[in-house]
Swiss-Prot record:
NCBIfam families: minE, PRK00296.1. Belongs to the MinE family. This is Cell division topological specificity factor. One of its GO terms (biological process) is cell division. Signal peptide: none annotated. InterPro entries: MinE, MinE_sf. Prevents the cell division inhibition by proteins MinC and MinD at internal division sites while permitting inhibition at polar sites. This ensures cell division at the proper site by restricting the formation of a division septum at the midpoint of the long axis of the cell. Coiled coil: none annotated.
Amino acid sequence: MALMDFFKKKASGSVAKDRLKLVLVSDRAGCSPEIMEQIKNDIIAVISKYIVIDQEGLDIKITQTESEGNNGNVPALFANIPIKDLKHSK
């Protein structure tokens, strides 16, 4: 069944919600939605070499977090990537 889920299209509401999240995150981070999408795609490509991930549940954010020391807030990348299975080397 997992293979069939791969080909299933996302509902338009879900796609719109993901796009809105991307716009909000990119605005906070000071980079364009296109750059955020490229970062997300690159992370997916690299991680997918080693593990099977749930792309539907993937959540990548750039937020402001308090720096150690007195440097104020700095951008931080947070990624929540649900793992379906590990790929075994041959």
